[in-house]
A protein has these predicted regions:
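Core catalytic alpha/beta fold that binds nucleotide/phospho-ligands
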Residues: 1-257
Length: 257
């Protein structure tokens, strides 16, 4: 079964000094190099992802949207070319571009999408499932030949205690309180860990995270029937938690949605 997981750091390129989406102003000197790289990355986007990208106004948001679309193209190209899927690959926008340039140019057929009842996206013409997530300056893409859900969370400063009290199940709150008394940093990371797990499961199911926030999922997700991968990731100066979830149980298909 073909599977791959990509982590992309979008730092290193920006839209300052006039750099922007296709059709924006060109800049002189060093900016021209950035503009050329951006245009090459934009050329990787399928029609739908390009429209989404062009609608984003914030500079960081544009880079994240650009990275997501380019990752989708890279994954499809690697799958169609018979390349081996890798479960954890760290990329920058420039290394992503370099990888696509090494793949057969004929493997760039149009990508079309369809959507489930709750808005979950699917490839319409590629036999792969995918799940996208972004946080901070990073984008995560997980792809597989079976249903998949993935989430990435930057462990930024936030009032996580208040959020856990509002959203988490009682046993999860108790666990976090016990950890907080012994090791506040570990408790903070556990909060993000649980959030990632719930998001990944919600994306796998196609129902989103809302139905599962107050439901204690951890033991169920660790069942023998489930494939759960999670961990900590450092990209640049930022630290993230991530989770990837799959299961043979209650497997949902495009036709069922």
């Amino acid at each position: 079964m073909w599977e791959a997981c990509y982590f992309l750091d979008v730092n290193g390129l920006d839209f300052s000094s006039g750099d922007g989406p296709r059709g924006g102003n060109h800049t002189e000197g060093r900016g021209m190099s950035k503009q050329a790289t951006l245009q090459e990355l934009e050329a990787l986007l399928d029609e739908e992802r390009l429209l989404k990208y062009q609608r984003v106004q914030a500079a960081q948001g544009r880079l994240l949207s650009l990275g997501a679309g380019a990752l989708l193209r890279l994954a499809v190209m690697e799958f169609l070319s018979g390349g081996e899927g890798k479960k954890a690959r760290r990329l920058t926008l420039k290394t992503l571009l370099s990888l696509t340039e090494k793949l057969p140019k004929g493997k760039t057929e149009p990508i079309r999408y369809r959507y489930g009842k709750q808005g979950k996206p699917y490839f319409e013409n590629i036999p792969l499932y995918f799940s996208l997530s972004h946080s901070g300056s990073a984008v995560m893409l997980a792809v597989s030949e079976r249903e998949i859900g993935a989430d990435l969370q930057e462990m930024k400063k936030t009032n996580w205690e208040k959020l856990s009290e509002r959203f988490y199940a009682e046993e999860e709150k108790e666990r976090l309180h016990r950890l907080l008394e012994k090791n506040p940093e570990r408790a903070r990371e556990e909060f993000f860990r649980l959030w990632c797990l719930k998001e990944a499961y919600g994306k796998w199911s196609g129902e989103g995270v809302t139905p599962y926030l107050a439901f204690p999922l951890l033991q169920d997700l660790k069942s023998e029937k489930n494939d759960l991968r999670e961990g900590r990731l450092s990209l640049g100066d930022q630290t993230y938690r991530y989770a990837v979830y799959q299961s043979e149980a209650a497997k949902q298909s495009k036709e069922q949605k």
